[in-house]
Amino acid sequence: MRAPTVNAPKISDLPSGTGSYRFLYFSELIKRPICVGKIKDRIGKLTDLVFSLTEPYPQAVGIYIEHGWNKPTEFIPWARVLRIEDDAIFVQPPGNGNTYPPFVDQPDWILVDKHLMGRTILDMDGRRVEVVNDVHLLESKGRMLIVHVDISFNGFLRRWGLGGIRWIKDQLISWKYVQPLSVEE
């Protein structure tokens, strides 16, 4: 059975209890500045989003940030993310006043850029479907969920910074029908 593609998510497809919400694409968030307090208090940039493989939709557990060359990467728990704006992601300062902990991968965690972007996905029968060009996220009530993957050429263009060019409609596959080929890599 081939996974159905959808042109736009329907309200009935959303997880229950979402209330007010907004959709984002991962390609719009990657490399976005991470700030503590004000926009001028930049501490790094987003390099990946970390999700727990919960059913039916993976839920964000944190963000993976980088400070620059030869500086350690850090993991900011999702509970410390205050808000996501068009120009930056705002977080609370580290609890101990010094730094956030380094990132340590956990079982049943998935990193969007590392494990999904550009990867082949399978349909429910284990057949190859397409390559993931972008990941469609739902932000609601302090949570972020993976709800779709985008296999369209538009997703490919967004991924490479050409999101203003639109050739065709987005082709979204609900996460319910997605199985990454490999998360262990």
What role is predicted for each listed range?
Residues 1-185:
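Peripheral interaction segments used for macromolecular assembly
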